[in-house]
Amino acid sequence: MAKFLIVEARFYDHLNDMLVAGAKAALKEAGHEVEVITVPGALEIPGAIALADQSEDYDGYVAIGVVIRGETYHFEIVAGESARGIMALTMDGVAIGNGILTVENEAQALVRADPKQKDKGGEAAKAALALLALRERWS
């Protein structure tokens, strides 16, 4: 049994609840332990994962958040930099599933977050599981 940390940026509570539910369900169904922490925003997710990984308490991570395009350039910065930070950690061997939605509107987010529809939280958890399996295979 592995231990996973879900790191969520809570901004849209109802959407986050669905994403976290999907991720938890996938991890628990696979027989793993799950903990959840909250950070202020998507930009803080990679940093929180890096700090948690130093503790060696967790085997893998799931990043959860929702970034909806607004009227300013902020969307591009948050979407790009959070993904870049997660990818940098992944390239260093950290097993992370990226469940940060980057969408045009709330309707798109709802379809992707809902475990009964696209279940992107569950998909992110399964990606983390797959990366953990690869890391264990090649370690």
UniProtKB/Swiss-Prot annotation:
Entry annotation: catalytic residues: 74 (proton donor)
Residues involved in 5-amino-6-(D-ribitylamino)uracil binding: 11, 42-44, 66-68, 98
GO CC terms of this entry: cytosol; riboflavin synthase complex
GO terms of molecular function: 6,7-dimethyl-8-ribityllumazine synthase activity
InterPro entries on file: LS, LS/RS, LS/RS_sf
EC number, as in UniProt: 2.5.1.78
SUPFAM superfamilies reported for this sequence: Lumazine synthase
Annotated protein name in UniProt: 6,7-dimethyl-8-ribityllumazine synthase
Protein species of origin: Novosphingobium aromaticivorans (strain ATCC 700278 / DSM 12444 / CCUG 56034 / CIP 105152 / NBRC 16084 / F199)
Origin organism lineage: Bacteria, Pseudomonadati, Pseudomonadota, Alphaproteobacteria, Sphingomonadales
